[in-house]
A protein has these predicted regions:
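Catalytic-core "active-site belt" of small-molecule-metabolizing enzymes
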Residues: 1-160
Length: 160
């Protein structure tokens, strides 16, 4: 995949892809989310946080993705890539099939493409300011762009 870092093209081969779930810093908020999902029939995680191995072929930089049915949604997430001892940070979406999630969270993570942004930053250059970064996901509803999800990295566990 081709990314940019400060205007320079950086080519990355992604050999392994993991999706982290249940990563909130606030234990009470994580427990509340687990309870909300349990009410929808989704089994609680075996541990917190929980890491899911998914196919690296799911990564895409396409501006459009195709999914099966209308029961999917994205979640804006930080993307970490390690190459030759360096770590880069970017944006990704853990697009998930919410209906399948009630049967298997692991399968729900594996069935949808994972869009990733093209811009990366070297982790060491921004690590002191990570908690101030705001991740925002916009969706189009009735022809208008609206905020679907927004939060700072201060809401999740430290990345490294």
């Amino acid at each position: 995949m081709k990314f940019t870092d400060a205007g320079e093209v950086v080519e990355m081969t992604i050999d392994h892809l993991y999706v982290a779930g249940w990563t909130g810093r606030n234990k009470e908020a994580v427990d509340h989310h687990i309870a909300e999902l349990a009410a929808l029939g989704i089994a609680p995680p075996s541990q917190v946080p929980l890491y899911y191995r998914v196919s690296n072929a799911l990564l895409t930089q396409s501006p459009m993705i195709e999914v099966l049915g209308d029961g999917t949604s994205g979640e804006v997430e930080p993307l970490l890539i390690q190459k030759h001892g360096d770590i880069w940070i970017g944006l990704a979406s853990d697009h998930t099939d919410r209906q399948l999630e009630a049967h298997s969270v692991a399968a729900s993570k594996q069935i949808c493409p994972k869009p990733v942004a093209q811009e990366l930053w070297k982790y060491d250059e921004i690590k002191e300011d990570l908690d101030a970064l705001i991740l925002r996901c916009l969706i189009q509803e009735s022809g208008e762009w609206v905020t679907y999800q927004q939060g700072s990295l201060a809401n999740i566990r430290p990345l490294a």
